[in-house]
Amino acid sequence: MLRLHDTALGHSRELKTREPGRIGLYICGSTVYGPPHIGHGRFSLVYDVLRRFLEYSGFVVDHVSNVTDIDDKIIGRANEEHRQPEEIAERYEAEWWEAMSTLGCLPPTQVPHATAFIEEMVEIVAELVALGSAYETSDGVYFAVSAVDDYGLLAHQSLASLRSGARVEVNDKKRSPLDFALWKKAKPAEPWWASPWGPGRPGWHTECVVMSLALLGEGFDLHGGGQDLVFPHHENERAQAVALGKPFARRWMHNGMVEARGGEKMSKSLGNVLTLSDLFEQSDPRAYRLLALQSHYRAPIEVTATTLSDAVSALGRLDALSGRLAEAGGVDSERGDPEVRDAFVERMQDDLDTPGATAILFDAIRRANVAFDAREAPRAAELTRGVLECFGAVGLEAKGAAEIPEAVLELGHRRDRARAERDFATADALRAEIVALGYAVEDTSSGTRIRR
């Protein structure tokens, strides 16, 4: 049974879903005002791995991830570029999905846009006002955090301690520094929608609570995002649901942040943000997935030229093993090693212990190579297929095997036969033919190995 860490509880517990065999995930998605960076990539990979493993385990996954297509940052970027906010949102959303595709992330089953749920947001805000949990001011409608007795549950802090340490925008119109905007009254030249409080637009925290409840229903299974969203965003979502008397997420999951060299936090203000497009120019996109797998999802991850290079080298071992399986050809065993699979699943079920699971698979790669070298092809194939199946379950596919055409592999087999018959002139000619086609040839104890 899969156990996952629950942020609200502070420890791991068994995953029990609302409906047996089915799970609803709401993952806070992108605010589309700039190019996606490696921080976005990290959280996308974390939840892609979660979804894939759930599906591998037999679950039907309802994966909802929103697009915030109206926000202060989008408006700010539009003003900078002298464009309309919707132009900015459309442009950067397209970049987002292109980057996610390159990373190999599965598209969510539903992608709600904030601007498509304005009517529902107005209804929720009006209900909160009617309940006395929200109040109108000259610049908008605010939620009163004092309306929720356990405000601070996700942050594991009391309301008093949150108030004393509050780092929020100063606004003398609010009753408390922690009160947050549900509806923002329109400023000149800003997009707006009609409401009982005049023209305006929803606050960020209102958007996600409305979309998650609308698409997954009350008491949905899991709400996820980065650790930077625990407070205030997710705390504020939860507070609205509590005030409305609506069961909200049954479990909260948060991933660690990306760090630059030396543990320095990655941020735009420090000028150390690496966009995903820059990353893809520097490295195989699969290397970032492997790097993410080698780090526990709740731990910070350091992304440097060195860590990416190490991941590329490790990928080379996976690709080479896949190539050896293709070169072996005609091996009867079509199944993966069950011990490898069972050990992999056991580690993954322990709060997605991807570092432990990955270590098991790379040890299996080592053992498979030993078996290939010893000409134990069936055992080597069984281990290799186990490795490929398990890595495939978390979205990491080997390259190499499928890229070498059968005709080229046949040249290698002919070369092996020539060498066995001590026809070295023919073997050398076949080697030259393979090299001329753009492939490298290695002589191993198990025969000719061909690589790109």
Task: Briefly describe each language-model feature range.
Residues 1-33, 48, 97-98, 119-326:
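Alpha-helical recognition segments enriched in aromatics with Gly/Pro capping
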Residues 9, 18-104, 450:
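N-terminal, positively charged nucleic-acid-binding surface of large information/translation enzymes
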Residues 55, 129, 435:
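Anion (oxyanion) recognition and catalysis
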Residues 59, 133, 439:
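Short phosphate-binding/catalytic loops that engage adenosine nucleotides
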Residues 107, 137-138, 443-447:
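Short Gly/Ser/Thr- and Asp/Glu-enriched loop/turn motifs at secondary-structure junctions
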Residues 109-116:
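Phosphate-binding beta-loop-alpha motif at adenosine-nucleotide cofactor sites
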Residues 264-267, 272-452:
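Structural preference for alpha-helix termini/caps and helix-kink/transition segments
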